[in-house]
UniProtKB/Swiss-Prot annotation:
Induction comment from the UniProt entry of this chain: Negatively regulated by H-NS. Positively regulated by IHF and EcpR.
Name of the protein: Probable fimbrial chaperone EcpB
Signal peptide: 1-20
Entry coiled-coil feature ranges: none
UniProt cross-references to Gene3D superfamilies, sorted A to Z: Immunoglobulins
Described function: Part of the ecpRABCDE operon, which encodes the E.coli common pilus (ECP). ECP is found in both commensal and pathogenic strains and plays a dual role in early-stage biofilm development and host cell recognition.
Family: Belongs to the EcpB/EcpE family.
UniProt KW keywords: Chaperone, Fimbrium biogenesis, Signal
Organism of this sequence: Escherichia coli O18:K1:H7 (strain IHE3034 / ExPEC)
Knocked-out gene: effects: Mutants do not express ECP and are defective in biofilm formation.
InterPro entries the record matches: EcpB_C, Ig-like_fold, PapD-like_sf
Keyword Signal attributed: yes
Entry annotated with the keyword Signal: yes
Gene: ecpB
Length: 222
């Protein structure tokens, strides 16, 4: 993936087949002050790929999240939804949020269907071969509430998100355990209503630091 994400409070999932389609970050965020998002995908192989993209709304990005109905048919749009991607080429996929401007955070699964162009062009008699040569990749898009309320509580090395939008939280400084070295860093996503305790950084130390991101705004906590 293009951006390394440390263990997340959000348990996002996705599969990126080796030497195939690179869809970038497993998790993407559309901040409350934006209604568009662009993702660049890349075909790192030496053959063309047929890419089809589908959107699903989820009740939660966690493992127990279920597919649910969108509030309206054009709640989230994308373009292009289908494309032929030449070898070693890239393409920008754009997403447009047109849903309710309320206080609710929304979660979507972007499903990328990727298959070698030679397989896609086979006749129906050989369609059974397509499934084994194809890949289904799932990534997550989080759309922050249009009316975001950022609130949190911090005490004794634990952060609680008391607002209505996911926070990116981090801690860095002396390691809590000597076996982990001298300096440690932790980086998580924290959903509304969830708490997270830092377990690698000694946040009680004077040199231990805790901070978070509210959208694009950096907030020192300790």
């Amino acid at each position: 993936m293009k951006k390394h994400l440390l263990p997340l409070a959000l348990l996002f999932s996705g599969i990126s087949p080796a030497q195939a389609l690179d869809v970038g970050d497993i998790s993407s965020f559309m901040n409350s002050d934006s209604s568009t998002l662009s993702k660049t995908i890349q075909n790192s192989t030496d053959s063309g790929r047929l890419i089809n993209i589908r959107l699903e709304r989820l009740s939660s990005p966690l493992d127990d999240g279920q597919v649910i109905a969108m509030d309206k048919p054009d709640e989230l749009l994308l373009t292009p939804a289908s494309l032929l991607l030449p070898a070693q080429a890239s393409e920008v996929i754009r997403f447009f949020y047109k849903g309710p401007a309320d206080e609710k955070e929304r979660y979507y699964r972007i499903v990328w269907f990727d298959q070698a162009l030679s397989d896609a062009q086979r006749d129906n008699a050989n369609r059974s071969a397509v499934a084994t040569a194809s890949a289904r990749i799932g990534t997550i898009l989080v759309v922050a509430p249009r009316q975001a309320n950022y609130h949190f509580q911090y005490a004794n090395g634990s952060l609680t998100n008391t607002g209505n939008a996911t926070l990116r939280i981090l801690a860095y400084g002396p390691c809590l355990k000597a076996a982990n070295g001298k300096e440690c860093k932790e980086n998580y996503y924290l959903m509304p209503g969830k708490s997270r305790r830092f377990t690698h950084v000694d946040t009680a130390d004077n040199k231990g630091r805790v901070a978070l991101w509210q959208g694009d705004k950096f907030i020192p906590v300790k």
